[in-house]
Amino acid sequence: MLAWAGAALALTAALAAAGCTSTPAATSAGTQAGSTTPEVTTAQAGQVFASYVAVADRAASTGDASLALANVTGVQKVTITTQLKAAKSGTGALARYRYGMPAFDLPRQDGYPRWFIASVTRSLVGRPGSPGGTGLALAATGQVLMVFQQSSATAPWLLSSTSQLPAGVSVPSLAADSAGYVATVPLNSGAQLARPDATGPLQAAVVDDGPASPAAKVVAAGNLTTGIYAAARVAMTPPAGDLYQWELEGTHYSNFALRTADGGALVFYAMYLDSAVEVPAILNKGVVNTGPPITVPGYLAFLLAQGQPVPRLRLDAQQLLSFAAVDPPAGTASTAAKIQVIAIGGGLIYASAT
């Protein structure tokens, strides 16, 4: 269980947001309200997707690092950077995929960044990009939700995240108008079970504390909530007397939300998953003496310097993860309606040892 400072305050704020009905409307994160921009068409989205796939495939087949980073941003850029480190170390590769025919969810929006979602079946070709760290195994072939963004009228379209749905999980129907555009949901909307911008903190409370968390009243159990909690508990093995902690926390990356057909929200967001094994004196701010050797999991080795001495004080790891979650409408007749986290992407990005 995690007990890092700030977790209780974050949970209190998130639970207060659940069921809130008096919050004024606001625009999605990063959107400039009131400006007029042309809508993204299906043809344009198709061109952006095809261009990305062609460049990514060429980069993966040649190992060209500059090309691999040329059309990505946000979570995806950090993920690719880590894959390149894994490839250089020989423990992974720049992941190469084959894609099926995409379907596009085009939001009705004003201002920048402009964005859209490509939903497509993706199959891994060859080695995975880098060793996993969540303990969750996703199939080599599965449906992914790809978020593409354009930061300004003159900026290129870039892929900002790719989140895969576990087998058996589906995306809910969205609220499209007669032209096929989907309504967005303000991140502080009170029309859902929880404000969309509270989805991440509520998920984090369950990942940090498990089924006993108060947030479990509004967040459904599953692979990407209680499953991450269960995996985190055994991800590292602390020596006798040392402490092991983990925390799912927010990031500076923009969140987006689309309205579902039933009035809920499909929310896209990113979180850091931090974990650490350390001698108690570090947490307690006491006199620090070296402890017994800390076991370094094999999947972290490529992120540490070669010849790194066995850590005896602290071992840190960080993952940057993208998620998609379904936030049901407020006042849903079923008392069992909860936030469902349906997709995950990203992975390990950092480790240190002392």
At which residue positions do the language-model features occur?
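Core segments of small alpha/beta cavity-forming domains
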Residues: 36-88, 169, 174-244
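Solvent-exposed loop/turn segments at secondary-structure junctions
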Residues: 75-76, 124, 166-167, 273-275, ...
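N-terminal export and membrane-targeting signals
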Residues: 1-10
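Long, glycine/tryptophan/cysteine-rich extracytoplasmic
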Residues: 33-36, 97, 302-307
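Bacterial signal peptide processing site
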Residues: 21-24
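Surface-exposed, charged secondary-structure patches
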Residues: 87-141, 242-296
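Short beta-strand edge/turn micro-motifs at domain boundaries
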Residues: 129-194, 204, 260-268, 294, ...
